[in-house]
Amino acid sequence: MGADIFITEEEAGMTEYKDMDVGEMRELYDELARQYERYCALGLELNMARGKPSPAQLELSMPLLDCVNSEADYLADDGTDCRNYGVLAGLPEARALIADMLDVTPEQVVICGGSSLNIMFDTIARAWITGLGGQTPWSKLDNVKFICPSPGYDRHFAICEHFGIEMIPVELGEDGPDVAEIVRLVTDPAVKGIWCVPQYSNPCGYTYSDEVVRGLAALEPAASDFRIFWDNAYAVHHLYDDPTLQDHVLNIID
């Protein structure tokens, strides 16, 4: 059955789409349509959504549904009444929890919404509309560029695409992006930031070396509103329980 469905090695090495004539494109389209129909005939029910926890993982959070009731303690460590509006930087217990996970101090943590991607989008939108650090809003500039270690996370790149930001690819190696190239690029004042997934980088799984982290922290960009988007999404998502087999990226704040 697999031989009838999947593209053969010969097809995988086919001519690139841009080099095909109309006849070749029609022939390929017909073949792919036939493969699609064979997939449909299998009657599979597959959820192809990315990043969804399994039922077993969801079970881990079940006790959270029972930990708050009318008899629970509703005062935070600093006396904040958790039934009321929150405090700007977040509850101290939450800041301490995240600080421990990210190897930083609670004072370096601000609790925002539950979606880091939404926070990153909003930060770019704020830079676009009002500017950062008192600088000109990016929307009023002739050109805005972002450094994009590649391969990288497509949702980062989609944010740039949404705002019309020019993306500059920089090769991602096993120890992180090419710092020497980044140092050269940030001499351009139009370069406003860089996307980074520093630990188990999506999609290759690379972790930035200490040398790379220090190099990024020491950047002297021409743009005073240059920002490093340090999307450490996999800080606690280790593949192995054995600590000796786990990666721990250097704390860029230090």
At which residue positions do the language-model features occur?
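Short, Lys/Arg-enriched N-terminal segments with co-localized hydrophobic residues
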Residues: 2-13
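Walker B catalytic acidic pair
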Residues: 232
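Short boundary motifs at domain starts and secondary-structure transition points
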Residues: 10, 35-38, 136-139
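Conserved core of the PLP fold type I
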Residues: 80-224, 235-253
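N-terminal "arm"/small-domain region of PLP-dependent enzymes with the aminotransferase-like
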Residues: 15-89, 100
